Structures are given as structure tokens and as C-alpha cells.
A protein has these predicted regions:
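Short, glycine-/aromatic-enriched active-site segment of Class I SAM-dependent methyltransferases
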Residues: 141-160
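Conserved Class I S-adenosyl-L-methionine
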Residues: 184-264
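Conserved alpha-helix/loop element of class I SAM-dependent methyltransferases that forms part
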Residues: 1-8
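A short SAM/SAH-binding and catalytic strip from SAM-dependent methyltransferases
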Residues: 107-122
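Short alpha-helix
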Residues: 162-177
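Conserved class I S-adenosyl-L-methionine
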Residues: 9-18
């Protein structure tokens, strides 16, 4: 939020809002939040979370919570969301956003945090830029997949695939005539397990995540290497009064935060 330069007075589109972690934080600051996602399950959880906090603004797409979300049937226009409230509705990157009340310059800031999952990246970035009056921002993967612990993968003898999402976004935004800026977020993640066996079988899935390059080493060899790695790096901890196991170092996931002023 701080990287996006949001102060709490803006109208913000949270595109690909998921369960609403960002949307709720923005509303708590006083922002007027339009939260859109293609997933009914995610929106149901956001709906409950926002309602519990008194942040929910009713009047999103007709039939909210059902399997049918017709466009253009709003009781509340997205541009009229009150401060500190969240208007959730179901909308995908591929939809015509104007049918949902999101025309040119509808919001101050348009954000897509770790959610630019689309077949046409350029079209999606154009849409995000078009609805913003001041600024558009995205957070995208840089380096290896967020699902993969690079240290574990290397220990298993697996070749890491680096993602170029940040380079693609930067290039497209530049080609669209904007001046993108980039900064980085390094997010530490830890996970605990109820037993060493659970840790082993959970981390063994690293091979599945890197399936395109996994044939360079046998399943048996990578599994043996993982066992050896865990013998050296799996440590016992106490969590909520119970014995658990975790790796001795957190996994750090790098993200690229890319923003650009649209100057409407």
C-alpha cells in the first residue's frame, strides 16, 4: 500500500482481490474500494470478511454469491462507493469492464497484486491503466515460482525455472507510453509441519512444480537428496503449545512492484 502511494482518501480498484486481504486493509485506511475477482469462492470469503467488519457495501453485481453474475445490473455505481467501504463483484480480466461500471478514469488507483493471471497481458495492462485517473500498480513474480523453495529444489538436484513476468510487464507498460518504476518486495514465508514425514512428503511436491525440468534426475535420487537435506535442516519448534517441525531458514519470495502514473 505504501509503495502505491495510497493515503486513504482514494477510490481504489483491487483487481483479482482474492479473499480481500488488501481490500480490507485499504478500507480500514478510509479508501473507497472496488474489489473484483473471477472466483466465486474467493468473493464469498471476502463478502464474509468485509461484512464482519462493517465494510461491506451491498449492491454489487446482481445475484452476488450465486453462479450467475450478469453485467450492468448495479444498485450502486462503482464510482459512488463510500469511504471505508468495499464493493465486491465478480469480474474477470477478459470481461468488458465498462459493462460493470468501470469506464475510463473510474478510480484514482488501480491495483493488481499478484493477480495478473491472463492470456493477454497487454490487454490486461491496458484495462488497468484505462480505469485509473492517477496510477496503476501490479505486483508480479520475479525469480522462481512462489510455490518453490529454491534451497529445497537445489538440494534435490532440480533445475530452477526463473519467471520473466516483471520484464514482460515493464516492457509492455513502456511500449504503452508510460514510465514504469520498479521496486522489490522480499516476503519471508515459514511453514510448520506436524511431523518430519509430513515435511518430507509436502516438500517432495517440489518436483511436481518443476516437472518440465525434473527428468534430469531420477525420482529416487531427488527423494534421497531431500531426506538428507531435511536431516540437516529440519528443526523442532513449539507452536501453540504443540511440537512442530520447520526448516531452519525461512523461504524468501521476491516480488517486483511495478507502478506507473497515467496522468489523466
Amino acid at each position: 500500500i505504501s509503495k502505491a502511494g495510497i493515503t486513504g482518501k482514494e477510490t481504489v480498484l483491487d483487481m483479482g482481490c482474492g479473499t480481500g486481504s488488501l481490500a480490507v486493509a485499504l478500507a480500514a485506511m478510509g479508501c473507497s474500494v472496488i474489489a473484483a475477482d473471477f472466483s466465486k469462492g474467493m468473493l464469498d470469503r471476502l463478502h464474509s470478511k468485509a461484512a464482519e467488519r462493517g465494510m461491506l457495501l451491498e449492491g454489487g453485481t446482481s445475484g452476488f454469491g450465486s453462479d450467475i453474475f450478469p453485467a450492468g445490473d448495479f444498485e450502486t455505481c462503482p464510482s459512488e462507493v463510500q469511504a471505508g467501504k468495499i464493493l465486491p463483484f465478480r469480474m474477470s480480466w477478459e470481461d468488458d469492464w465498462a459493462n460493470y461500471g468501470l469506464g475510463k478514469g473510474s478510480v484514482d488507483v488501480a491495483v493488481a497484486s499478484r493477480s495478473v493471471i491472463t492470456h493477454d497481458l497487454e490487454d490486461s495492462l491496458k484495462k488497468l491503466s484505462a480505469v485509473a485517473r492517477e496510477r496503476a500498480c501490479v505486483t508480479v513474480c520475479t525469480g522462481v515460482s512462489p510455490r518453490v523453495d529454491a534451497r529445497v529444489a537445489r538440494a534435490m538436484g532440480l533445475e530452477l525455472e526463473r519467471h520473466n513476468d516483471a520484464l514482460f510487464v515493464f516492457g509492455i507498460v513502456s511500449d504503452l507510453g508510460y514510465e514504469p518504476t520498479v521496486s522489490y518486495i522480499h516476503s519471508p514465508r515459514t511453514k510448520s509441519y506436524i511431523s518430519p514425514d509430513e515435511a518430507y512428503y509436502s516438500l517432495l511436491r517440489t518436483r511436481d512444480y518443476l516437472a518440465d525440468t525434473a527428468d534430469q534426475i531420477s525420482v529416487e535420487e531427488s527423494a534421497c537428496r531431500l531426506r538428507s537435506f531435511l536431516a540437516d535442516h529440519l528443526v523442532e519448534i513449539e507452536e501453540d503449545g504443540a511440537k512442530r517441525w520447520t526448516l531452519d531458514q525461512p523461504r524468501v519470495v521476491p516480488w517486483a512492484f511495478i507502478s506507473w502514473d497515467v496522468g489523466i
